[in-house]
Amino acid sequence: ANYHFILNGITTIQNGASATTSRSTLNDGDTITAELTLVSGCVVSATVTLIENIVTAGTISPVNQSICSGATPTIITGVTTPTVNPLANVSHYWQASTDGFATFNNIMSNTENYQHPTGITTTTQFRRVDVSELNGQTCSDTTVPVTVSVNAPPVGNLLVNGTAQASITICTGDTPIFTITGGVASNSYTFRINTGVVTHTNTPSFDPVALGYVFAPGVTYSVDATIYNKPLVAGNPDPTACTNNTSSITIITEATP
């Protein structure tokens, strides 16, 4: 018997005694015809058409995000659907990585959009995997990743009269000065006494007496601050700023003898 394999009705791939053959390069829509010639001279043939399971990933948005540590990323939405063969079945799943997809985790299946359920503390990339299934053959392609950059909270230590301490006793009429060390020039601050806001400021120092605050004798006060990583906007904290709260300092006021 003789086996004759023909590409697109023109090109002979093999013509001989072997019933199998191979070819490294084939294209969508190519046809392969196999002709079997028996010793008797009878000829039978069959033709198959090759359909390539092409998939080109869609796009997702936003391109990148920047959030504060512990915040939840905004929803990542599918902008365009993948390009596939019209006869293919399409599905999706999502992946997350903190090392540029050297390693990654599969995190959700068969959704065009993705909402991360919790806050994150490490810069993370997310991408969608678009899957095409056609005639039992599964192929996939990944979208360009969305990078969610995590900004570390601002740092600083609250001092009173230049010293870090949990509490201080003052006499009536004394002027405790509070400062925050360890910050950067672009930070801003909210200083509070007994949870009430006394001032918003771009400077890391707080003189409550100069602002008219009176420490009454026999009363205990708690002073703390919030640090923002952006300057004030129209005298108020920037709502987009990342924040960090200092520890509190207890002020015990005694009457002057």
Model-found features: residue ranges?
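Exposed beta-strand face motif in extracellular beta-rich ectodomains
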Residues: 28-32, 122-126, 217-223
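Surface-exposed, flexible coil segments in extracellular/virion-facing regions
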Residues: 4-24, 95-119, 195-211
